[in-house]
């Protein structure tokens, strides 16, 4: 089949080489955007008097036929035509004849593909933003149910201090809020039209770039044509933002994986988000959480792959940039699906509140409470820290916990200790009293929930 760019060439191409150079297997995802860009471009060509209105009408009608066929799944693409742009132009030629060749006036595939990617990413990021907003709602709803659910807080994966489970959930709410802000802020750098930049230097035709940008719903145009066709920062930024978002999902998934284990039993995932074993009948595995954790590395790989492709590229277009799409498509799908799966897991998981709270009774996470108690009685904190540390060692040697120590022994250690110490050492009191701003105290959690609901 004759190439649309074949005038310069005498030799025939070979199918296996065509296959290697073709991108239609993946860039056909942007067929809708490519058709939209072409419709805006031909409207601009007509408005500016670059092609006759009658020819513009023919081209427009042909493009709309292709849109209808695309919606019905009736368009067939070929690797012979390399990419989505040449495939659509060839299909348009079959629909309306030689006048289709005028569509590419004042346009290059360089600004065409960049336009497609901006359009595609803009819409896809908007969908991710909606899913992220939904996840934040789910977290707040779950947190409202567990303001007074006590759980161990950890450092080094060792019991540290007791927390409200709502406090733990709202920590992730904060992370996902920053993810949301990053994505929303990035849209202004996606929402820019490169159309009209042509190959790299602009065009001699009297085009109106602002008009085509307006038709496509862009807020601005690239001020520099060379930048317009060379820029892939908007994709890198999306991949970077996605990597951070997936990292947050992965951290939470790691905790869910631990919490569903027999050793923790803090939560139970519903059957829909779990799988069994082909040999061990008793198994209920948190596979969806594990997959999100695993797919995080995949998204990181897409980011580093894109950075590596671009690191040595001179301006403007190079064939290397064909490698900018699959990582973007893959990340979009991975992030979207991961968010939806994760929100479903959180929304439906069962929280074993009694087991959570019981686990704070069989540890020394109340040791700080005793140190603070002594400090409030006038004992220098470092001295109080030393006293409590020695008492913890003594308790571990005797197989008891701080709440099991007799009052008489406490008063031998320090006569300032009174019988209110047992209330102080309870995990619920420990959580309740931490009412510094942003702390885990119940009153602070309620304030935090009211504040978060204003941002939903």
From Swiss-Prot:
Q: Which UniProt keywords apply?
A: Amino-acid biosynthesis, Arginine biosynthesis, Cytoplasm, Lyase
Compartments annotated for it: namely:
Cytoplasm
**E.C. no:** 4.3.2.1
Any one Gene Ontology cellular component term annotated for this protein: cytosol
Q: In which pathway does it act?
A: Amino-acid biosynthesis; L-arginine biosynthesis; L-arginine from L-ornithine and carbamoyl phosphate: step 3/3
- What does the record give as the reaction this protein catalyses? 2-(N(omega)-L-arginino)succinate = fumarate + L-arginine
What name has this protein been given in UniProt?
Answer: Argininosuccinate lyase
Organism for this UniProt entry: Listeria monocytogenes serotype 4a (strain HCC23)
User: Gene name, please?
Assistant: argH
């Amino acid at each position: 089949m004759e190439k649309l760019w074949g005038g310069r060439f005498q030799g025939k191409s070979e199918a296996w080489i065509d296959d290697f150079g073709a991108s239609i297997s993946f860039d056909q995802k942007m067929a809708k955007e490519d058709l939209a860009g072409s419709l805006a471009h031909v409207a601009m060509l007509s408005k500016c008097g670059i092609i006759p209105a009658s020819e513009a009408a023919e081209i427009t009608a042909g493009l709309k036929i292709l849109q209808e066929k695309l919606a019905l799944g009736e368009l067939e693409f070929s690797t012979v035509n390399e990419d989505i742009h040449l495939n659509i132009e060839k299909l348009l030629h079959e629909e309306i004849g030689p006048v289709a060749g005028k569509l590419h006036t004042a346009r290059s595939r360089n600004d065409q593909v960049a336009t497609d990617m901006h359009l595609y990413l803009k819409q896809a990021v908007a969908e991710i933003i909606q899913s992220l907003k939904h996840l934040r709602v789910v977290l707040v709803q779950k947190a409202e149910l567990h303001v007074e659910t006590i759980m161990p807080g950890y450092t080094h994966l060792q019991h540290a201090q007791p927390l409200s489970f709502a406090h733990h959930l709202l920590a992730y709410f904060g992370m996902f809020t920053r993810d949301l802000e990053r994505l929303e802020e990035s849209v202004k750098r996606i929402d820019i039209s490169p159309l009209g930049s042509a190959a790299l230097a602009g065009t001699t035709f009297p085009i109106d770039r602002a008009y085509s940008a307006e038709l496509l719903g862009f807020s601005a145009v690239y001020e520099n044509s060379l930048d317009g066709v060379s820029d892939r920062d908007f994709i890198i930024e999306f991949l970077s933002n996605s990597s951070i978002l997936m990292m947050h999902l992965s951290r939470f998934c790691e905790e869910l994986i631990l919490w569903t284990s027999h050793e923790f039993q803090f939560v139970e995932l519903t059957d829909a988000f779990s799988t069994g074993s082909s040999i061990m009948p008793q198994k209920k595995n948190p596979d969806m959480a594990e997959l999100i954790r695993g797919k995080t590395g995949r998204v990181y790989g897409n980011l580093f792959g894109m950075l590596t492709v671009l690191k040595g590229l001179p301006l403007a277009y190079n064939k290397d940039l064909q490698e900018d799409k699959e990582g973007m498509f893959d990340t979009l799908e991975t992030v979207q699906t991961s968010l939806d799966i994760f929100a479903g897991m959180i929304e439906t998981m069962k929280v074993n509140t009694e087991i959570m709270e019981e686990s704070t009774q069989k540890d020394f996470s109340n040791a700080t409470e005793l140190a603070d108690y002594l400090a409030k009685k006038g004992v220098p904190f470092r001295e109080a820290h030393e006293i409590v540390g020695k008492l913890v060692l003594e308790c571990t040697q005797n197989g008891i916990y701080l709440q099991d120590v007799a009052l008489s022994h406490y008063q031998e250690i320090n006569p300032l200790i009174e019988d209110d110490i047992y209330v102080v050492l309870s995990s619920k009191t420990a959580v309740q009293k931490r009412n510094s701003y942003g702390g885990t105290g119940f009153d602070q959690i309620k304030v935090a929930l009211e504040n978060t609901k204003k941002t939903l």
